[in-house]
Amino acid sequence: MSMNDDIKTVLVSEEQLKAKVAELGARISKDYEGKNLVLVSILKGSVVFMADLMRAVTIPCNIDFMVVSSYGGSNTVTSGLVKIIKDLDGDLSGKDVLIVEDILDTGVTLSKLVPMLKMCNPNSVKICTILDKPSRRKADIQPDYEGFQVPDEFVVGYGLDYDEKYRNLPYVGVLKPEIYTK
């Protein structure tokens, strides 16, 4: 059985993703020209977007990675508690930080993470997300760079998973409810 069989509908195609990443890369390159840009990928979900975005950014930049969780295992609901599993390797002092996220959902994780990063004395901290789900927002946080707004559906692909599956789909799709309500 193919992973595609578990998808109810494709929300964002591979072609749409490629075009949007190129557009975001061009905007970020222009906005951060002459600055000391650090792209901070929030793993695991943003790894695919990060790999594509960093190649679309045409100015020098550093990259770093964090593993942060407010979900557990196959849970589909945030716990509201943010746990740093892997912290940054580099120093953010005096740098312009752009958090690279797969999806901005409730905003709880980022609303706690942004102030933590600001304590590292960067010049700025902004957010870039490929997907935004504003209908589920619980925290007062908005992306500075946004790819696509998506409805309140369980989405997978392009780095997003359910129980560590579907990350490698080249598109963003809605998972059939029977898959995650078993």
Predicted ranges, named:
Residues 1-182:
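PRPP-associated nucleotide enzymes
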